[in-house]
Swiss-Prot record:
Its EC number is 7.1.1.2. It is a multi-pass membrane protein. Belongs to the complex I subunit 1 family. The chain crosses the membrane at residues 6-26, 67-87, 103-123, 143-163, 174-194, 220-240, 256-276, 296-316. It catalyses: a ubiquinone + NADH + 5 H(+)(in) = a ubiquinol + NAD(+) + 4 H(+)(out). It holds the Pfam family NADHdh. This is NADH-ubiquinone oxidoreductase chain 1. GO terms for molecular function: NADH dehydrogenase (ubiquinone) activity. Keywords: Electron transport, Membrane, Mitochondrion, Mitochondrion inner membrane, NAD, Respiratory chain, Translocase, Transmembrane, Transmembrane helix, Transport, Ubiquinone. GO terms for biological process: aerobic respiration.
Length: 321
């Protein structure tokens, strides 16, 4: 293998991990200000080095395995979670994707579905009833909300004319799809909150019920891997939301401007994730499921039929001259 072929993926991975580190600092700062306190402000200027101190602490701690755990799956689950979270960035145009695929959207949906295996493995291999119940909740929640995500993606494909993420950037040169499909965007954004197990849908870690959920038995570096995977998924989902609904136009002469515009919009969406966490209480589990199956599913199916039927009905009209 040519050594130059390793450089772009390595740069992408390092950039994602650095972004995750500063995202955790940003979250703690925003949560602090919303709760009328300062947040981290000791380690480094303005507390910016706090994530690196936390990471160093977790890496240097001793790895402890529960006595009755299944060691192979126990270690494999967080590793698989982080590997999948990093691999899902490959088809995203920023501005040039690492893997320019014709079915990039389908690949992202398929790989996000594989994340449930890491949740299930971690809960089952921990041999703890709290971890297993948290894993079952996470799996049910993730699989359920992927139904809505898939239907909304189908609606976007009908409007853009292709499964390629590059096609979406070309389609949105004259007009953002968010303006034409704002109900779908609102449901997509809410579904990404549930897909990433974020508040107010963080049912996997109810402190009074399941303590920390599927990762309750984890500590040291495996816990850090789960933590990195969670925040990498948050940034990925918001970057995908930007590409689907708010994509900058195709870069022609300054690709750096495309990247800056894309990541600025993704950062604003990510900050609204943190705003939602500070503002809303946790849903009950039955409310979470009713929201999807009784509200989002009928609405997304109706919008999908609307997006497919309106263009076909226009074909029968006489030419507008």
């Amino acid at each position: 293998m040519d050594s130059l072929t390793i450089v772009p993926p390595a740069l992408l991975i390092i950039s994602i991990l650095m972004a995750v580190a500063f995202l955790t600092a940003l979250e703690r700062k925003i949560m602090g200000h919303m709760q009328l306190r300062k947040g981290p402000n000791i380690v480094g200027p303005l507390g910016l080095l706090q994530p690196f101190a936390d990471g160093l602490k977790l890496i240097t701690k001793e790895l402890t395995l529960p006595l009755l755990a299944t060691p192979t799956l126990f270690i494999l689950a967080p590793t698989a979670a982080l590997m999948l979270a990093l691999a899902m960035w490959s088809p995203l145009p920023m501005p040039s994707p690492l893997a320019d695929l014709n079915l990039g959207l389908l690949l992202l949906l398929a790989m996000s579905s594989l994340m449930v295996y890491s949740f299930l493995w971690s809960g089952w291999s921990s041999n703890s009833k709290y971890a297993l119940m948290g894993a079952m909740r996470a799996v049910a929640q993730t699989i359920s909300y992927e139904v809505t995500l898939a239907i909304i993606v189908l609606s976007i494909v009908l409007l853009s004319g292709g499964f390629s993420l590059h096609t979406l950037t070309v389609t949105q040169e004259p007009l953002y799809l968010a303006l034409a499909t704002w109900p779908s965007m609102m449901m997509w954004y809410t579904s990404t909150l549930a897909e990433t197990n974020r508040a107010p849908f963080d049912l996997t870690e109810g402190e009074s019920e399941l303590v920390s959920g599927f990762n309750v038995e984890y500590s040291a570096s495996p816990f850090a891997l789960f933590f990195l995977a969670e925040y990498a998924n948050i940034m990925l989902m918001n970057t995908l939301t930007t590409t689907l609904f708010l994509s900058p136009s195709t870069p022609t002469f300054l690709p750096a401007l495309f990247t800056i515009a894309l990541m600025s919009k993704a950062l604003l969406l990510t900050m609204s994730f943190l705003w939602v966490r500070a503002s809303y209480p946790r849903f009950r589990y039955d409310q979470l499921m009713h929201l999807l199956w009784k509200n989002f599913l009928p609405m997304t199916l109706t919008l999908c039929l609307w997006h497919s039927s309106v263009p076909m009905s226009m074909f029968g009209l006489p030419p507008m001259t």
